[in-house]
């Protein structure tokens, strides 16, 4: 018996973990601003009830959906249950951090609605147009193919490359496509006709990456950047097909390029570095060092907004160029969320770094946990999450602002090659060497759907900007479209 008590010890232990009837909470935004007074709420308050309380405090005309976090753990059940599970002390006012969610909801893709043969070698790259109406695919058969998403049928076969088409990128205004090949050439295409606009030559080895200047900086889109095995980065004018600048401070192959929204170009290389360039002058601003092996992949926190320009999740954009540019500016600023642009890098050294490259050459965080090389990193469209795909067959989820670890997703039985997010940031899809696609849910940290169907390795995946379709391609030469 416990001293001074008529209760046996096991009953005392139960009393110690009893939930308080009420909890004092303080709402705080994800940038640290306190909202409203401290509130006395019942311990069984739900996330939906917290949402109603917060909308009342914010006095907004439109009631918005929110996610709530305590100590960076999302509340997905009654508050008291969440606090007990996570051993959170409530001796002082509890800081409840809120984040707005997308006002629209993407439904998970669940079935293959089209298997589109046509390529005669492996499909190496797929990308949806910013307006979500077309899909472009690049293949080892040297062609770019365009597909109509309304009818799920082939539109055009674009010929020009003399070797594998390694990368495909739509301009953010949906008016052009650039492809980079194993032959070292860059081809520009008119997606309306499938005709070549012209060829850009200058690289001496194969093209590893291409990226367009964002629409909020220039419309119509004219400039794009390419990276190559020849160690250089080149900026091109799409209308004249001339090389405007050639930047060469990397000592080994360039593996990835990104054109940021604040006037910088980012490049990663097998020389273990990430370089930050001034996009107007081609001057090296700073070099980000820390990786111990090849840097394979880069991702930008505002990438979804940069890729889609003036096109929102309904696939609509103003027809007037000035209005379109203004909308692209608004979408980029909203994606930034009042913070500097963040960059993530993933490497053969099994680690990732999170950077604020416009302000510092020191990383915000070093992210460890993968047991093999990292193939790809990708920010969610709202910039709050970061996922990494690895040869260790796992996917890891990280906080996109702080770089802290959130979850590991296991289910693939082969290396994970690529990942793509749904437009509402609630799900992502992965493609693997094991021939499957898998849809994962962020809130539950679990597998949502398994999508078998490919006969061999899945090299490339993309989720349409409107959220309605997923495209995948790989070694079996067949392009597949997946829908709800």
PLM ranges: what are they?
Residues 137-141, 179-183, 226-230, 267-271, ...:
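Conserved strand-to-loop turn within each blade of WD40 beta-propeller repeats
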Residues 111-114, 153-156, 195-198, 242-245, ...:
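A structural motif specific to WD40 beta-propellers
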Residues 33-48:
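Short, contiguous acidic and Ser/Thr-rich linear segments
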Residues 126, 138, 144-147, 168, ...:
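WD40-repeat beta-propellers
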